[in-house]
Curated annotation (Swiss-Prot):
Disordered as annotated region, ranges: 1-32, 58-88, 156-222
Protein's name in the database: Survival motor neuron protein
Taxonomic classification: Eukaryota, Metazoa, Chordata, Craniata, Vertebrata
Residue span, Tudor domain: 91-151
GO cellular component: axon; Cajal body; cytoplasm; cytoplasmic ribonucleoprotein granule; cytosol; Gemini of Cajal bodies; neuron projection; nucleoplasm
Highest rank taxon of the organism: Eukaryota
Gene giving rise to this polypeptide: SMN1
Biased composition, class Gly residues, residue ranges: 1-12
Protein family according to the UniProt entry: Belongs to the SMN family.
Length: 294
């Protein structure tokens, strides 16, 4: 009995000595592990030194810019000015097709160079289809109107394609079923919605003919811009040209832009046909007077 009790009593101290760590029995001195004060100070010091260096660098760059930029710009301008002044003298000659600005209305018309004065850098142009002559500066002459029109059409086509892609994407997200109808309505040219201009008078009553008192080449006015039409005119996929419809009756569905567009279009069409009728009657009267004198 004494040996068994002694053996059991001697085994307990061996088990207690084999325990290395027991949680919760004491306070561990590991609070310094989460102390990042030194790290924060080092970060703040690095950021402050970087900002200081960056500030000094900006001051040096801005102070050096004004010294270099003024020297480069005059050289580019002089080159472009030399090209512009030398091009008209070498480009234009008698018989060339060009476009010139009529001094009375400021519009561009196709013309042909009749004579050139290289000393004065001027020329005399004859407006195609009218016979009017006018002196122009060689530097003011423009490319033939066909080339200008082609460039304008290409730019307009590119802009229309870009706007069509953007509108198609937005409309597809709203109403996928109406995609074919929208494409058909957009493919039609915008100027087909306007009534066609009145036919020009016959060869006996045209402007620029002998016996008539037309001072300049008054062509029919161009149609209104497409953005003005789009704000008030509903799209028509097909059909013959029609008269612009009146504005809607309901005032709630009509905003200021739509009302202004409708008013301007009505004024434009009224003045267009009124001016044509008055000019046509004047041509008839002057034509009769010239025939009676002959």
């Amino acid at each position: 009995m004494a040996m068994s009790s002694g053996g059991s009593g001697g085994g307990v101290p061996e088990q207690e000595d084999s325990v290395l760590f027991r949680r919760g029995t004491g306070q561990s001195d590991d609070s310094d592990i989460w102390d990042d004060t030194a790290l924060i100070k080092a970060y703040d010091k690095a950021v402050a030194s970087f900002k200081h260096a960056l500030k000094n660098g900006d001051i040096c760059e801005t102070s050096g810019k004004p010294k270099t930029t003024p020297k480069r710009k005059p050289a580019k301008k002089n080159k472009s000015q030399k090209k512009n002044t030398a091009a008209p003298l070498k480009q234009w000659k008698v018989g060339d097709k060009c476009s010139a600005i009529w001094s009375e209305d400021g519009c561009i018309y196709p013309a042909t160079i009749a004579s050139v004065d290289f000393k004065r850098e001027t020329c005399v142009v004859v407006y195609t289809g009218y016979g009017n002559r006018e002196e122009q500066n060689l530097s003011d002459l423009l490319s033939p109107i066909s080339e200008v029109a082609n460039n304008i059409e290409q730019n307009a086509q590119e802009n229309e394609n870009e706007s069509q892609v953007s509108t198609d994407e937005s409309e597809n997200s709203r109403s996928p079923g109406s995609k074919s109808d929208n494409i058909k309505s957009k493919s039609a040219p915008w100027n087909s919605f306007l009534p066609p201009p009145p036919p020009m008078p016959g060869p006996r009553l045209g402007p620029g003919k002998p016996g008539l008192k037309f001072n300049g080449p008054p062509p029919p006015p161009p149609p209104p811009p497409p953005h003005l039409l789009s704000c008030w005119m509903p799209p028509f996929p097909s059909g013959p040209p029609i008269i612009p419809p009146p504005p809607p009756i309901c005032p709630d569905s009509l905003d200021d832009a739509d009302a202004l567009g409708s008013m301007l279009i009505s004024w434009y069409m009224s003045g267009y046909h009124t001016g044509y009728y008055m000019g046509f009657r004047q041509n008839q009267k002057e034509g009769r007077c010239s025939h009676s004198l002959n």
